[in-house]
Swiss-Prot record:
It is found in: Cytoplasm. Belongs to the MurCDEF family. Its main location: cytoplasm. This is UDP-N-acetylmuramoylalanine--D-glutamate ligase. The gene is murD. GO terms for cellular component: cytoplasm. The keyword rRNA-binding does not apply. Pathway: Cell wall biogenesis; peptidoglycan biosynthesis. ATP binds at G129, T130, N131, G132, K133, T134, T135. One of its GO terms (biological process) is cell division. It comes from Burkholderia ambifaria (strain MC40-6).
Length: 502
């Protein structure tokens, strides 16, 4: 379970969800445990004690002395930035002493490897990206389930991977397929993780305060791929396509792309438009008599295919709104097909999926105006995707804690789609300065409630009022879900005023 180590002493840093899962897993396997957190009484400490886990707890600043006493593995919680000076010093000391530094994902990878010696060989699918991870992860899980597989969905999406694995072992119900949502934080400490197929949905500015630079952030995303992983890449995103192997490389045949245009390479996915209808399509070899032959020819690379667009389903048959969600659906389909699941049940499942709360979720239509909750849109890339995905006139509500982002990517979609922008929160002035060149009316509001009511007055039939803040919520709210609740309450008030229902 721990590489070549037997019941090692483990230092767990941070007692969040992943840290608690690491502690549980290590205690389960008889490891000596030391747990450290910068907080004297972290919320999960009570859970740790209630479960009777035998561990030394140290509260306060991290120091290299935490490694003393025989520590063999450091288990690092994903919320802790390795750039933080005290943690950086501790990690440097661990490296000097040849002490392994693992995150939960590496513990999970090592556990699967150990279980493999007993014959357990599940398929593992992984999804990362700045935006769309949760939607694509849940959708991929549903596709695999509808194909008759036992599926476990875990990771950044919750539950923690190790908790889900422990439950599967206890219930003698190990899944056929693992579908993992992985953040850049989780991938930062990946060492031997090698899923069967993995997708990078997009890479835009986010968490730069944690990683230090965009290049470091992108590099962390790239750790989702192992040496034999099928790569599912968004060809519309230049940062993602940097992870595509060179043409003719040994692993080029294990690369699949998706995008919002017609695919040109065999086995890729995209959209094709005909008579005003957008279709999800796959590029196929017109001359191949069957799929097996087509895949063999792609792998061997000795045949130049005559490409045809195979229609899979109309994009309008998806229940999730927006072109960005069509891209997410293509990524999920590509992942499931990469492990040879049959297409027919996957396509039925695509029509079934209803989407996730707070992710471009239409919560009401009042007087022919859609009210759309995208409170999970906590970065610029998410808001750009929502604007371009809805592709209609929009009154946008944006603002909050910008986390040092560059708001410039908002200029083009705001100029194209927005009737007006309502600004809230700490970084409203920075967004206003950036969007001034668009000529779109901008209005500042002290509260989200005021912004929603003002947006409703400006919206015209056929428009959408979109809450997609491009910012974190903590300057005004407990979290993005609290922000969404306030938005929904304001929309309910508007419905009552207009004599409508939501």
């Amino acid at each position: 379970m721990f590489g070549d180590r037997q019941r090692p002493m483990v230092l767990v840093l941070g007692l969040g969800e992943s840290g608690l899962a690491i502690a549980r897993w290590c205690a389960r396997h008889g490891c000596r445990l030391r747990i450290a957190d910068t907080r004297e009484a972290p919320p999960n400490l009570a859970a740790l004690q209630a479960e009777g886990i035998d561990a030394e707890f140290v509260g306060g600043p991290f120091t290299p002395s935490l490694l003393d006493g025989g520590v063999e593995i450091v288990g690092l919680s994903p919320g802790l930035s390795p750039l933080e000076p005290a943690l950086a010093a501790l990690i440097a000391a661990a490296n000097e002493r040849a002490i392994a530094v693992w995150g939960e994902l590496e513990f999970f990878a090592q556990a699967l490897r150990a279980l493999g010696t007993s014959g357990y060989q599940p398929k593992v699918l992984a999804i990362t990206g700045t935006n769309g991870k949760t939607t694509t992860t849940n959708l991929t899980g549903l596709l695999c389930q509808r194909s008759g597989k036992k599926v476990a969905v875990a990771g950044n999406i919750s539950p923690a991977m190790l908790d889900r694995l422990a439950r599967a072992i206890d219930e003698t119900a190990l899944p056929d397929v693992w579908v993992l949502e992985l953040s850049s934080f989780q991938l930062e400490t990946a060492r031997t993780f090698a899923p069967d197929a993995a997708a990078i949905l997009n890479i835009t500015q986010d968490h730069l305060d944690w990683h230090g630079s965009f290049d470091a952030y992108a590099a962390a995303k790239g750790r989702v791929f192992g040496a034999t992983t099928t790569r599912v890449l968004n060809r519309d995103d230049a940062a993602v396509m940097k992870f595509a192997p060179a043409a003719g490389a040994a692993d080029a045949a294990r690369t699949v792309t998706f995008g919002l245009n017609e695919p040109a390479q065999q086995g890729d996915y995209g959209l094709s438009r005909d008579n005003g209808i957008a279709w999800l399509v796959e590029a196929v070899d017109r001359d191949a008599p069957d799929e097996t032959t087509s895949r063999r020819r792609k792998r061997d690379g000795v045949h130049t295919p005559d490409i045809a667009q195979k229609r899979l389903m109309p994009a309008d048959a998806l229940r999730i709104r927006g072109l960005h969600n069509a891209a997410n659906a293509l990524a999920a389909f590509a992942l499931a097909r990469a492990i040879d699941l049959p297409a027919a049940p996957l396509l039925h499942a695509l029509r079934e999926y209803r989407g996730e709360a707070h992710r471009v979720e239409v919560i009401a239509t009042i007087d022919d105006v859609d009210y759309v909750d995208d409170s999970k849109g906590t970065n610029v890339g998410a808001t750009v995707a929502a604007l371009d995905g809805l592709a209609q006139k929009i009154v946008l509500i944006a603002g909050g804690d910008g986390k040092g982002q560059d708001f410039a990517p908002l200029v083009a979609p705001v100029a194209r789609w927005c009737r007006a922008v309502m600004l809230i929160g700490r970084d409203a002035p920075a967004i206003r300065d950036t969007l001034a060149e668009t000529g779109v009316p901008l209005a500042d509001h002290a509260t989200l409630e005021a912004a929603v009511h003002a947006a409703a007055e400006l919206a015209e039939p056929g428009d959408a009022v979109l809450l997609s803040p491009a910012c974190a919520s903590l300057d005004m709210f407990r979290n993005y879900a609290h922000r969404a609740d306030v938005f929904r309450a304001a929309v309910d008030e508007i419905a009552i005023d207009k004599g409508a229902t939501t």
